[in-house]
Amino acid sequence: MTEKGLETIMVEYLRNHNGYEQGQSADFDREYTLDPGRVERFIRSTQPDKVEQTMCFGPESQRRNFFRRLSDKIAADGITNVLRKGFRFNGLLFDLYYPIPSELNPSAIDFYQRNIFSVTRQLHHSAENTLDALDVCIFINGFPIITAELKNHYTGQTVKNAIKQYQDDRPATDPLFAPRRCAVHFAVDDEQIMMCSELKGKDSWFLPFNKGVNGGAGNPWRESKILTEYLWQEVLTKDSLADILENYAQVIEKEEEGKPKPVKRVIWPRYHQLDCVRKLLFETRSNPIGQRFLIQHSAGSGKSNTITWLAYQLVTLVEDDENIVDSVIVVTDRVNLDKQIRNNINAFKRLANIVAWAEDSASLKEALQGGKKIIITTIHKFQFILDTIGGSLGNMNFAIIIDEAHSSQNGAMSADMNIVVSGNSENEEEDIEDHILKIIKGRKMAPNVNYYAFTATPKNKTLEMFGTPVQHPDGQTGHIPFHEYTMKQAIEEGFIMDVLRNYTPYKSYYKIIKSIEADPEFDKNQASKKMRGFVERQPQTIKEKSLIIVNHFLDKVIGAHKVGGQARAMVVTSSIIRAIEFYYAITKQLEEMHSPYKAIVAFSGEKEYCGKMVTEAIINGFPSSEIEKKIEKDPYRILVVANKFQTGYDQPLLHTMYVDKQLSDVKAVQTLSRLNRCHPKKKDTFILDFANDPEDIQRAFQTYYKGTSLSHETDPNKLNDLIEIVEDANIYTDEDVLEFNKLYWTSAPREDLDAIINRCVARFKDELSEEQQIKCKSAIKSYVRTYPFLAAVMPFISPEWEKLYHFYYYLGTKLPKLAIDDWTEGLIESIDFDKYRIVEQEEVNLSLSDSNAEIDPVPVTIGGGKSEPQMESLSKIIENFNTLYGGIEWEHADTVRAQIQQLPALLAKSESFVNAVHNSDSDTAQLQCNTDLFQIVINMMAENTEFARNYLDNETFRNFVNSRVFQQARAIV
């Protein structure tokens, strides 16, 4: 099959099965970049009175004026906006397209059917190069909407050749390929489809428009079928294309630094976004309200746009002339999602001013009463809103869209949300039992709400609460996402970067010494952890790591012109104090190296530092709200963070991450995934990790690389196990629980509740051993943590469990804090910091296996009991610590130290090294350094063989010395 053969199949299908007209290249007017004959035919067919009043198609001068103004309007506003909003000429508004009717209105159906869909092969589009022809162009009412270049494997050409053709031979100076003139450009072969919404020559960025196969890139294999035929058989049907133009495609405006006017960008949905929203809308329309959907879409996959399109279309869904949902509530941690949704929806014509931002109860009430259809709120404000507005909404239907569901749903908050939207609010005339039953029902998913939970990293609670139930052969019920766009597919399609491809761990080596004559004993396990923390917070440690960070960033990132010279870096620290220390150390290093670049520190709240209370704004010298914009422009290049910007932060310029914080599971994936956003000039990423084992990072990513499912549901009877543990302690009676709940549900004074709780606390203190106290309190805490979640998902209700929940909750807050014996008291005062060094390990590609992950449900267990200390003498603890973390133990340490200190000066005398520094790049100079140092060390063997032997035999040590001496010697030549 030739390229023309694929073209024939596509065009013939559109004509014979989708009702397209066959256009001719001669129909196309190159001056106006449209098909004037079909434009005129459509307008005369639908608006003859306006044609007569304006005389827009005659005389000829008027006709030319009409088409010239129309063409200019499309060039300025974009074809999608002009089709939606129409075109004014001589005081009248001309409709250029009629949307899909939302109800059975014969007139609306008739006008929609008058839209003219046409397809033209071999379109000679260029006035300058009249022989050049585009393979396929799709028109609606005479306006070009879609272009396509087709290739075929059988002729030795693929989608890559089609992309190259667009980049080389389809310049934006040609009106047909100018920005916003067409909605999208497709590069197609018989196996893959790529799309580009704005051509920019060599910088044209094509994204995949494939279905995906087995959780990865590509399209499902179909014997004797063209793998890409879904484009013309499914996507380009009249109703489907009309739906995309009306509800997805848009031109949005975004302000960019240094540009006087907002930059207009064309948005076209990718296949997984289109597929996801359409399937969700179908299920919403086909089933009664009260459904739950979990959408597992990879970080960086465009969840914000998917949420926007879903929210907008949910409020327009109609059944029997009534809205299926009255309002959509979007719960998010990202404040900027409000502006994004508002801007996106403003691009649509049919609904205007429908989005509200609710940050307190008053604004939420105002939004609901004012008919706002989409209400956005953050998780931090949602609790207050739900507690305040009462339960008068039970007669309304809601859709609740949860952005990053794992962080936005806990049992107690879910219960309050369900109570409010279901109308299960407090009623003073109810008896206690009735009210408890309503609270339990409120914990369950409200019957008048559909939940749409989006996340890239679903936890077990999220899967069980929102996932689709599936029956396993063993009778257990698991849960799976309703829709998936996996990390694997996103990486393979080139939509996000593989952040684990260039991962370099660093290993720290420390040595500490005893600072007292005595040799006391401490718990060796507690001591080792405490000593490592002591070393890690030493100024020398921060200085060494900061030097590595700055040198690497300047040499390997800035020096290598990463992201076209625009690369940014993030330093992830373990605490606010550590972030501040790193910020000042990095700032000092940059200044000493006379670098033009600066760092920014980011943390929440205020913190005492050097005797003063400081905030990020005080340290940075500008408001916190400006951090995201500041880091995008020079001189700011390095962002130092403490538990901030580690989730939901979308910055394509971010190229390198320096990690000095232990990360695990979801936190590891979320944090490192900040690097995965693509940029046309971003070819790779880099992670330099001071704190984590590469295998732990690899294991965390593997869980969310492909599909993630829940193995089986949580067994509610595990709660009975916890209750039995608490009851065995005999610190309360059944009468205590009943009396407490009676008082609690009748809003009795706090002192009446305390009288009951205090009796139980007294028994806890007086009658239980320390081991029993630990076991009892752990069971109470586990019950309080687990019950709200289980109550939301279990198929039955238990008033007794609900009563115990409230009783345990208050009891748990009053129980004394159990002291964890500190068997290291006085340790820090007994030691001193002696040596610290940090060594680069081998760079690795943390590849992931092609397999789905299955995770277990929420564990319903208590913590471990009291552990016995393992006492050892301080000298032995120090010996073991230095052996574990100290690397080489030197016999003649002072001599070795003196030899190492000589090396920079000796190296600086080498002409070959000096020439390399002044005339070569950093990598070449480092290689010359390594060569010259090798000879210098050989020459030093006569003095002391210990240093030379370790340098020659220990590659890790040799690399450390080479790197450090290179930096020091370069600074003096």
What are these regions (language model features)?
Residues N410-V499:
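Post-DEXD/H (motif II) to motif III coupling segment of the RecA-like Helicase ATP-binding lobe
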Residues R532-V641:
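Conserved C-terminal RecA-like helicase domain
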Residues E21, D35, R41-Q47, V51, ...:
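Catalytic cores and motor modules of nucleic-acid processing enzymes
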